[in-house]
Amino acid sequence: MNLQIEMEHHRGVLIVRLSGELDHHTSDMVRMQMDEAIQRRQCEHIVLSLKNLQFMDSSGLGVILGRYKLINQKGGEMAVCDVNPPVHRLLDMSGLFKIMPIYDNEVNALTELEVVS
């Protein structure tokens, strides 16, 4: 399976929706596209929706942590939402939720980042 990336900008937030598999085959593409979007659009925050992400390995984890560090260095926040059980387990075991909040859906994430219209 491959990976689809959908990106949207909403009031200073880069919303990234991933579908498919985030692994060593697709992680570089995600990293490059997110970095370009962050630099080009001057995003303050990131919301990462994993609703349709079927699988993720340590390469995917690295992409998420790297984007977290990047946006954090700019004074922004990153949140994860819509995480399915297998991916949730990996993120939980990695300790990611100790540094990054998780929300049930995009609306809740945007509300917490105080950018809902």
Curated annotation (Swiss-Prot):
Domain of life: Bacteria
Free-text description of this protein's post-translational modifications in UniProt: Phosphorylated by SpoIIAB on a serine residue.
Gene: spoIIAA
Coiled coil, from the record: none
TM segment ranges: none
UniProt GO molecular function: anti-sigma factor antagonist activity; antisigma factor binding
Residue ranges of every copy of the STAS domain listed in the record: 3-113
General function of this protein: In the phosphorylated form it could act as an anti-anti-sigma factor that counteracts SpoIIAB and thus releases sigma f from inhibition.
Keywords: Phosphoprotein, Sporulation
Entry's Gene Ontology BP terms: sporulation resulting in formation of a cellular spore
Pfam families, A to Z: STAS
Name of the protein in its database record: Anti-sigma F factor antagonist
Family: Belongs to the anti-sigma-factor antagonist family.
Modified residues (Phosphoserine): 58
Keyword Glycoprotein carried by entry: no
